[in-house]
């Protein structure tokens, strides 16, 4: 009896084939075989939004082969990924191959190993049409918004632009943050920090001014700070109280898609799309010495914190065997999954805890190793005992010369801790954790006299909210309910590739084009860029999945309002064209002599002649650097890739093909005199192949205004 098993990717097919016998033919659909054709709307609005699917261009031969294999097989099993998208792919395959939808031909497994695959194959289910409907509803919604709204935005701002149901909200978040930064007015404040030594130790410790006998004091000006310093002239310092305690720090839960993307961004510098690509490779698996062919992690698109009891027991056994029983948490932790989570899968975890990162390293690329290490350590730490710290808080009383023989005094506080038991931190520390070597205080008791070593008054200014990074934007999308685990990476990738947002030193900054699109949508399509409205649509899609609402009724409700808004916007904006700012340059047009201007188009900035339409001359806009090309000596210019990444190349391209991701600097190589470029890890390097000079970049010291008390 022959059986045909269809999965999405060829690599996944190769892995699964190793677990099944010769009677199984495992093949790949290579993603979707049907989709909505891009050339037209492909949705019959008048017929309850019936989608008009077509075979994906270029897959006709593959579909023919799948049909032939299905016709010759005694049984066809659909083993695509276990989520909405995977369910929809299975449904499309069943429809095209003529498989009955009431038969049990859908196979699911959350991890790829022999046990999970054979268990899934042995217990097929029917295709879940609620999951399929939820995916179709999302696809149709996105097509309606994109197909109807994009032409309007293009007509009013610039040809070739696009607007999307979720991407527009993401751009709005970035734009709103930029507006907050622009409107921010910094406020001055001061801190007063002292260094003391105690009788028991020669090593100085830090303490911060907190107030006086009247209570807490916030220092806002230099004058206020100087007044306190005057009070502290010839002061005597003593310990007024010592409070000791114990702090227990718990580990973070295992990863969800969002937290994995955030941590990979923060710790590894990976962009979300790259993280998901590597995670997919780890999920699909490889040969690991001593363990055979196996997937290394569970399914990576999840918002659940749940882990199976089997995985918990395997992890606990590994911890006890390798670290000792004291590193096991006294009772199982059950992390609470948020109410809006789909919870269709476990959290992201290693499939086999015994496959440590070091064991897997030989089978992995450097990037795979880094991400697997992060996932493995995070999961194992979540099972481990708490970190126990002994804390101490010291209050210091300062009585200056003028305050003696009165009830007046100033107060300083110092706090610190020592680690009594490292617990889970032996394996994993969150990216934001403080350094354990800091904050340790000497043995000290109430009444001890302290010796002042130095006193510094430091000027500060309140800081505006930080721009989003890719990780913090994903966190905000998750917190506000916009998007789902399967969409976070594509959202960020889309808004950067379309030049609505650019990356500047890992921060996301809106372009003039992005701001113009958001302004237009805010004025005429407030719901489309409304965070709460978009989140409610995501919630409705979840309800479709759980058979709580009908997806066709949901589409009618959305489209009726959207269509009226679109028609009103067209009427209100008839004849109106939004003109983006054009900066004049000192570059003459070689055709007519006018000074060219910088314009913003679909693919970013370019130079254009202001004499349009009489003169239609355009040319690429390049940003020159001070560096010279190490190959031919030409100028090094800044460029943008098709995906929105910044790189640097020679002005003489294509005659000279020099290109680098490393940022050029003003420094020259002491060996050959050519420009130095800044590589990862703070290394300055000469890129001349015949030179190879490298040195560590010097850190710029931060300057602060201080006042010192002798």
Regions found by a protein language model. Give the residues of each.
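Core structural elements
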Residues: 138-149, 166, 196, 247-259, ...
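Metal- or metallocofactor-binding catalytic centers and their adjacent structured scaffolds
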Residues: 215-253, 448
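Structured, non-catalytic alpha/beta "coupling" segments that mediate domain-domain communication
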Residues: 14-38, 168-218, 382-437
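Basic, low-complexity terminal or inter-domain segments flanking catalytic cores
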Residues: 2-3, 24, 150, 183, ...
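Short acidic, hydrophobic short linear motifs in intrinsically disordered regions
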Residues: 239-242, 250-264, 291-300, 464-476, ...
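C-terminal or mid-to-C-terminal helical accessory/interaction module adjacent to the motor/catalytic core
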Residues: 115-194, 245
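Conserved short loop/turn motifs at secondary-structure junctions
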Residues: 1, 81-82, 158-162, 244-253, ...
């Amino acid at each position: 009896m022959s059986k045909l098993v269809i999965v999405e990717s060829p690599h996944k097919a190769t892995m699964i084939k190793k677990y099944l016998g010769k009677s199984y033919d495992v093949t790949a659909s290579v993603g979707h075989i049907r989709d909505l054709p891009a050339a037209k709307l492909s949705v019959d609005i008048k017929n309850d939004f019936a989608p008009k699917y077509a075979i994906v261009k270029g897959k006709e031969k593959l579909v023919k082969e799948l049909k032939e294999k299905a016709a010759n097989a005694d049984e066809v099993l659909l083993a695509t990924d276990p989520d909405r998208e995977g369910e929809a792919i299975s449904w499309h395959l069943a429809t095209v191959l003529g498989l009955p939808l009431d038969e049990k031909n859908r196979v699911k497994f959350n991890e790829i190993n022999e046990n999970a695959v054979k268990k899934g194959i042995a217990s097929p289910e029917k295709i879940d049409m609620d999951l399929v409907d939820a995916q179709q509803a999302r696809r149709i919604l996105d097509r309606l918004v994109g197909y109807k709204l994009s032409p309007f935005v293009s007509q009013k701002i610039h040809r070739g632009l696009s607007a999307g149901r979720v991407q527009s909200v993401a751009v709005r978040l970035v734009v709103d943050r930029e507006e907050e930064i622009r409107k921010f007015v910094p406020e001055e404040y001061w801190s007063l920090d002292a260094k003391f030594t105690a009788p028991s130790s020669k090593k100085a410790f830090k303490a911060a001014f907190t107030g006086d006998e009247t209570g807490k004091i916030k220092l806002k000006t230099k004058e206020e700070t100087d007044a306190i310093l005057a009070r502290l002239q010839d002061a005597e310092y003593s310990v007024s109280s010592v409070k000791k305690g114990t702090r227990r720090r718990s580990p973070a839960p295992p990863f969800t898609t969002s937290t994995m993307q955030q941590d990979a961004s923060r710790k590894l510098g990976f962009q979300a799309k790259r993280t998901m690509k590597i995670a997919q490779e780890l999920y699909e698996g490889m040969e690991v010495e001593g363990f055979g062919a196996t997937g290394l992690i569970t399914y990576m698109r999840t918002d659940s914190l749940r882990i199976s009891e089997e995985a918990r027991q395997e992890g606990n056994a590994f911890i006890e065997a390798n670290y000792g029983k004291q590193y096991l948490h006294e009772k199982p932790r059950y992390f609470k999954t948020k109410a809006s989570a789909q919870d269709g899968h476990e959290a992201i975890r290693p499939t086999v805890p015994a496959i440590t990162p070091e064991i897997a390293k030989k089978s992995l690329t450097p990037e795979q190793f880094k991400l697997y290490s992060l996932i493995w350590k995070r999961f194992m730490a979540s099972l481990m005992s708490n970190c126990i710290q002994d804390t101490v808080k010291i209050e210091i009383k300062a009585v200056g010369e003028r305050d003696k023989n009165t009830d007046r005094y100033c107060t300083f506080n110092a706090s610190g801790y020592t680690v009594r038991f490292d617990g889970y931190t032996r394996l994993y520390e969150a990216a934001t954790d403080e350094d354990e070597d800091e904050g340790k205080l000497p043995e000290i008791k109430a009444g001890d006299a302290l010796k002042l070593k130095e006193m510094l008054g430091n000027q500060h200014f309140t800081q505006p909210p930080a721009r989003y990074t890719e990780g913090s934007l994903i966190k905000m999308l998750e917190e506000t309910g916009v998007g789902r685990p399967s969409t976070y990476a594509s959202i960020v990738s889309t808004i950067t590739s379309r030049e609505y947002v650019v990356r500047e030193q890992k921060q996301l900054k809106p372009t003039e084009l992005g701001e113009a699109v958001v302004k237009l949508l805010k004025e005429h399509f407030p719901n489309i860029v409304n965070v709460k409205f978009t989140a409610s649509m995501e919630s409705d899609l979840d309800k479709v999945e759980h058979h709580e609402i009908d997806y066709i009724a949901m589409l009618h409700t959305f489209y009726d309002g959207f269509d009226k808004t679109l028609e009103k916007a067209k009427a209100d904006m008839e004849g109106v064209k939004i003109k983006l700012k054009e900066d004049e340059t000192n570059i003459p047009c070689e055709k007519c002599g006018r000074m060219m201007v910088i314009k913003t188009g679909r693919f970013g900035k370019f130079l254009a002649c202001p004499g349009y339409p009489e003169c239609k001359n355009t040319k690429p806009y390049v940003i020159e650097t001070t560096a010279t090309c190490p190959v031919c000596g030409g100028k090094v210019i800044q460029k943008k890739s098709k995906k929105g990444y910044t790189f640097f190349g020679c002005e003489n391209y294509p005659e000279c093909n020099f290109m680098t991701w490393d940022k050029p600097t003003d420094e020259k190589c002491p060996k050959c005199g050519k420009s130095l470029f800044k590589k990862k890890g703070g290394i300055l390097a000469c890129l001349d192949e015949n030179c190879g000079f490298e040195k560590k970049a010097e850190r710029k010291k931060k300057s602060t205004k201080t006042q010192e008390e002798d």
